[in-house]
A protein has these predicted regions:
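Acidic, PIN/NYN-like endoribonuclease modules and their adjacent C-terminal/linker elements
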Residues: 3, 72, 104-140
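Active-site neighborhoods of divalent-metal-dependent phosphate/nucleic-acid chemistry enzymes
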Residues: 74-117
């Protein structure tokens, strides 16, 4: 079973029902709910989601939404090792590198993000948009 790491923007699409992104992000999430993939996110993802969503839907709704999503998303550990690796990396985006290191520690097969800049390290974990992942998944 594929282990996928969900970047912050994917969970925000669902919590905030952001258009036109909701359908693709929700379809990825549905694969996790139905047990076809295992979904992971880092503690940083959860914090960033609540922080960002509270501005648009309010704090309590942001917490409620994350609680609902957390039933299906495993927490990828982020500790001293991931912080050290991110600090020693030569990438230009520290937060993306932290996320990448959390995904690597959780042995994720890929990262799903809508981040078009994709400043993640290029060391082996594929980076895909929700649409790319869904197309790839349905071709398996």
């Amino acid at each position: 079973m594929k282990r996928i790491f969900l970047d912050t923007n994917i969970l925000l699409d669902i919590i905030e029902e952001r258009q036109p992104f909701l359908v693709a992000s929700a379809n990825v999430f549905d694969l996790g709910i139905s047990g076809h993939v295992q979904m992971f996110a880092s503690p940083l993802t959860f914090a960033n989601c609540v922080y960002t969503a509270r501005k648009n839907v309010g704090y309590m709704q942001a917490i409620h939404g994350m609680r609902q999503l957390k039933h299906y998303v495993r927490t990828a550990l982020m500790d001293d090792a991931q912080v050290t690796l991110a600090l020693e990396s030569d990438t230009s985006d520290f937060e993306d590198t932290l996320q990448y290191e959390a995904a690597a520690a959780a042995k994720c097969d890929l990262i799903v993000t809508r981040d078009k800049k994709r400043h993640f390290p290029q060391r082996g974990i594929p980076i895909m948009s929700p649409e790319e992942f869904l197309k790839d998944y349905h071709q398996l």
